[in-house]
Design a protein with these regions (language model features):
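Non-heme di-metal
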Residues: 1-190
Length: 190
């Protein structure tokens, strides 16, 4: 597969750059969430940052070296509140899965690069999940439901692992004394 001079080559580089920048932005957003007392949201930004790194690596591997010239625009320079960051992240993810990667996949298909088209399409599926998760977190923060729910649940301390039952997380962990920010709804997914 020789991409040299193709639009697919440019699209791969744009996707690589975009994913790399999203990864870094998400690490900044994770720090902000932690400062605001949202340990789980911070961890979700960090997890998503790792996903973006892997997406960047997939696009990078397709390129196979060389120099590619292109002009592109990327969001820069703003770290807002956790809610603002979640909204910005959701918008970026929506652009990727809703427009960018489907279009890039179509171009790759038309130019005879079905493997690259498949990569764009499967990564788009992940980005759709990221957008849904970010939007759900915005809703949870805005409704004051990060640490308080309408039903009885189990809450797990992310620091020491204590699991307690209640409609809201304790103000502090009775075991390790870490603040409420370290609690998340406990889910057994194994």
């Amino acid at each position: 597969m020789d991409f040299k001079g193709s639009q697919t080559e440019k699209n791969l580089l744009a996707a690589f750059a975009g994913e790399s920048q999203a990864r870094t932005r998400y690490t900044f957003f994770a720090s902000q969430a932690r400062k605001e007392g949202y340990e789980q949201i911070s961890a979700i930004f960090e997890e998503t940052s790792g996903n973006e790194k892997e997406h960047a690596k997939l696009f990078f591997k397709h390129l196979k070296g060389g120099i590619v010239e292109m002009t592109a625009s990327y969001p820069a320079g703003v770290i807002g509140t956790t809610v603002e960051n979640l909204k910005a992240a959701a918008a970026g993810e929506k652009l990727e899965w809703g427009t960018l990667y489907p279009n890039f996949g179509d171009v790759a298909e038309q130019e005879g690069f079905p493997e690259v088209a498949r990569t764009f399409r499967t990564v788009a599926n992940v980005e759709a999940y990221h957008e849904r998760r970010y939007n759900k977190l915005v809703e949870s923060v805005n409704q004051g439901k990060v640490f308080k729910k309408d039903q009885l649940l189990k809450w797990k301390c992310r620091n020491c692992g204590l699991v307690v039952e209640g409609t809201e997380a304790p103000a502090a962990c009775p075991t390790c004394m870490h603040p409420r920010s370290y609690f998340e709804v406990w889910v057994e997914n194994y």
